[in-house]
Amino acid sequence: MDNKIIVALDYETEYEALSFVDQVDPSLCRVKVGKEMFTTLGTNFVKQLHERKFDVFLDLKYHDIPNTVARAVRSAADLGVWMVDLHASGGLTMMEEAKKILEPYGKDAPLLIAVTVLTSMEDLDLLQIGINASPMEQVIRLAHLAQRAGLDGVVCSPQEVEVLRTHCGKDFKLVTPGIRPEGSDVGDQRRIMTPKQAIETGSDYLVIGRPITQAQDPLSVLKSINASIR
């Protein structure tokens, strides 16, 4: 079964993170390791997650010159992660070289996903960095660029999924943060949606953090979310 839930492991210590993953079942979710945890704990932490049979989304959002990003993506593949991402705004050549370096890995290559517009950003935020376009317009532009580069999909807000399905087709993976079960705190992400709404709209994978990781009974919450999207 293709797990649609990716749990964001946003903890300050290895003990807290491993205590959480030991409470849940790798058949019910995948896990995401971001910049903070990877910078603190490194590759050994990812290996410990693999030992527990979890698929890992390495969410480091690479953005650098093409050669540097390609080598970083290769290192992620050598680590055995399931998914890795980079910033589409790094350009076509950067994305093409990152995809090309994965060719020798064949079916064992991680999914290579592009970040389009961060879910915390709105029109004014884009304007302040010199982009005179709405988040939706910029997402479409960057998604087309990522698809042209041969990437597997993009990270986008749930509200952009339906439009991207039209523009990029059914096989282009759509990974959606900004997912909050009903009754959850919105936090710092402005463009949000419930798991059920996101799947019905066409999301492939849902990134969910605090509603699961800060729950008194995370396994029950995870089971409930999975039940809601079946």
From Swiss-Prot:
**SMART domains hit by this protein:** OMPdecase
Q: Name one GO molecular function term.
A: orotidine-5'-phosphate decarboxylase activity
Chain positions recorded as substrate binding sites: 10, 32, 59-68, 119, 180, 189, 209-210
Q: Which UniProt keywords apply?
A: Decarboxylase, Lyase, Pyrimidine biosynthesis
Its family remark reads:
Belongs to the OMP decarboxylase family. Type 1 subfamily.
Task: Indicate the quaternary assembly.
Answer: Homodimer.
| UniProt function note | Catalyzes the decarboxylation of orotidine 5'-monophosphate (OMP) to uridine 5'-monophosphate (UMP).
The name on file for this protein is Orotidine 5'-phosphate decarboxylase
